[in-house]
A protein has these predicted regions:
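N-terminal leader/linker segments that initiate helical-solenoid repeat arrays
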Residues: 21-71, 220
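Structural register within alpha-helical repeat arrays
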Residues: 39, 69-72, 105, 135, ...
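Residue-level signature for tetratricopeptide repeat
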Residues: 42, 71, 75, 108, ...
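Solenoid-repeat scaffolds in large eukaryotic assemblies
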Residues: 49-52, 81, 85, 98, ...
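Post-signal peptide N-terminal segment of secreted/secretory-pathway proteins
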Residues: 51-150
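Alpha-helical adaptor scaffolds
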Residues: 72-74, 89-90, 102-107, 282-293, ...
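Conserved small/polar residues in nucleotide/adenosyl-binding loops
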Residues: 367-376
Length: 377
């Protein structure tokens, strides 16, 4: 029995030793791999590609090996076959730098003008704007025009500059006769709203000759928003001219709110604005008159404008202003002006209850506060 016990203990001791040695070897192995990984990166940076090629196969089990593979693929992307890129993406779907590889390779296939190969590689729309433009151009090049023009329109309608790769798609769309001139007007409006004067000027200059009058007026307005009254009086009133005038008006209000306030009646007359369009201008000015430095006339005008407004955020801003100045009467007035949905917010429930307590309506105040507490659980 004692002999058997001694044998068991020897076996256990041997097992522990083997495990310790194994772990030490594994630790050494990881240290060596880490060292070789650093060697490869340095050799790569120094363009010592023979060293890179010799050491890379020894790191296939190292956790960071996919990063080396990614660099190997992208350093020579123009010569990579589709299957290599596809296999890498499928094998490393969560690798952070690999997430943009699909879009990069779509652009590479576009450079090769391999339109069918591009669509086979990326059956779905890629992520980046440049790749999307190449994707929809490939649709056009392979006869799928309806999809191509739908994609072109989606990419066109932005106030931002688009990548050069989009020029081919937009050019094909324009040449097909399928691009509505109104899409120019809509993009000009978006560019104007984004403050992209250069794009406004470029787009206006590309418009058909029968749009020359409005094109010239738009360029002048983009370069000098303060000329908005001249623009409003010299162009026929359309939805487009009204929208452009509103965007320019917002710019005027930022620089000179009083000038903008006094300008509203003239813009209303020149562009035949309805009540909703007029209120949009009032709202723009009212937002700019929330400080303590306004005149009595401006304050009365502002409150009248807010009283007519359908903008919940503007009315809420006025409530906060009343709170900030300790204006209890104003607080009551503007809380009452909030739509029912906004009144149910915890913030406004509290102040409604506070006002009820002040007026001696304790039960109503408790109901409001208890509802607020219950809704917060």
């Amino acid at each position: 029995m004692e002999k058997a016990k001694r044998v068991v203990w020897r076996l256990l001791a041997a097992s522990v030793c083997v495990m310790a040695v194994s772990q030490a070897v594994h630790a050494d192995s990881l240290d060596e791999q880490r060292s070789r990984y650093a060697q490869i990166k340095q050799a790569w940076d120094n363009k010592q590609m023979d060293t890179v090629q010799a050491l890379m196969p020894t790191l296939k089990d190292y956790p960071l090996y996919p990063y080396l593979e990614y660099r190997q693929i992208t350093d020579d992307l123009m010569n990579q076959p589709t299957v290599t890129v596809n296999n890498f993406i499928q094998a490393n779907p969560t690798l952070p730098p690999a997430r943009n590889l699909q879009s990069r390779f779509v652009n590479e296939l576009a450079r090769r003008e391999d339109w069918r190969g591009l669509l086979a590689f990326s059956p779905e729309k890629p992520n980046t704007t440049e790749a999307q433009c190449n994707y929809y151009y490939a649709k056009w090049a392979t006869g799928q025009q309806e999809e191509a023009w739908a994609g072109a329109k989606e990419l066109w309608l932005t106030g931002k500059n688009q990548p050069n790769a989009c020029d081919s798609l937009f050019g094909a769309w324009r040449a097909s006769g399928k691009q509505d001139p109104l899409s120019y007007l809509e993009r000009i409006r978006l560019a104007m709203k984004a403050g992209n004067t250069r794009l406004v000027t470029a787009l206006a200059g590309q418009m058909p000759s029968d749009y020359q009058t409005i094109s010239t007026a738009v360029i002048s307005l983009a370069n000098d928003p303060n000329s908005v009254l001249t623009f409003a009086r010299s162009t026929g009133a359309t939805d487009f001219t009204r929208q452009m005038a509103a965007v320019a008006f917002a710019s005027v209000a930022r620089d000179d709110v009083e000038n903008a306030r006094l300008m509203i009646p003239q813009l209303v007359q020149a562009q035949q604005l309805n009540e909703e369009q007029t209120q949009e201008l009032r709202d723009i000015v009212a937002w700019r008159l929330m400080g303590t430095d306004v005149t009595d006339e401006q304050a009365r005008w502002r409150d009248d404008a807010i009283m007519r407004s359908n903008s919940t955020s503007l009315v809420e801003r006025r409530v906060r202003m009343a709170l900030g100045t300790g204006d209890r009467r104003g607080l009551n007035t503007w809380l009452a002006r909030l739509p029912m949905e906004a009144k149910e917010k915890d913030e406004w429930r509290y102040w409604q209850a506070d006002l009820l307590l002040e007026r001696g309506r304790d039960d109503d105040a408790k109901d409001r506060k208890s509802t607020r507490l219950n809704s917060s659980h």
